[in-house]
């Protein structure tokens, strides 16, 4: 389906929980309130809505959280999504802590690709960022994913004074392994709003100094998301830059987000949207739900306005689904 600005909206990010087993300082630090169990959509509700999204042209679904793997039954949800006519790809974004043990069942369910958060290679820094001592588990998850052959992307948020000294070491993972190592600008959303970041142009300059033969790369393997990818001769993978603040890519945005509470958000940086849970639970039929989805997509804003204030912490990434 095309929105009011001619963008083909075919990608749904599906947040299945607000819970997480880490406490990353820019996303979900200690002390944030949990949602009530009854406020979260059931898998049956997610699948009913996903089938309607498919009728609107959604062909790619990414399962997110919180941390999606802390919710029981994500494998069954994956299989259910894959069975919906029109859904071509189902992907997962995870912190990786539970990935090694969950991956076989996810692959059997038809999972197509996985994105794993990795902000550091050092245990002490990992504890500082996440509040937990789980780096080894994350690394095991990455190794398991690479060994399985499923496409792997790693996501890093550069943070001055925290992990900026090891960004080249993280980038070098793409030199050594067949993966995409992506660097995402800190966004002024929720708890990340008060934290400093490094811009995409700054990062690219650093990486060019280290690897002067880096060249932009494109193609189907790099998807149609916001990242701009680079590689060099002899590399097994690539690095990606997602410059959400300094390289606004709204003109090519192709996605909408459904929160775990059933709120359809057409833009990551906007408070606007539609409460599909209220419609679902008040007895709305499929025609009414489909119309609500279509109206929300048509109302997708032209662009974000990160420079004009931040979203409140109560609307943190862990609630939106990233």
Language model: regions and residue ranges:
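Conserved, mostly hydrophobic/aromatic
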Residues: 16, 20, 24, 63, ...
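Residues that scaffold the ATP/ADP-binding catalytic core of kinase and kinase-like folds
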Residues: 23, 27, 71, 124, ...
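A short acidic, helix-capping loop that chelates divalent metal ions and anchors anionic groups
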Residues: 32-36, 100, 122-129, 190-194, ...
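Radical SAM/AdoMet-radical enzyme domain recognition
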Residues: 40-63, 70-184
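Auxiliary Fe-S-binding modules of radical SAM enzymes
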Residues: 1-11, 168, 176, 186-189, ...
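Glycine-centered loop/turn positions within well-structured domains
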Residues: 22, 123-124, 248, 274
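Short, small-residue-enriched loops and turns at beta-alpha junctions
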Residues: 16, 35, 67-71, 159-162, ...
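Canonical Radical SAM [4Fe-4S] cluster-binding loop centered on the CxxxCxxC motif
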Residues: 4-44
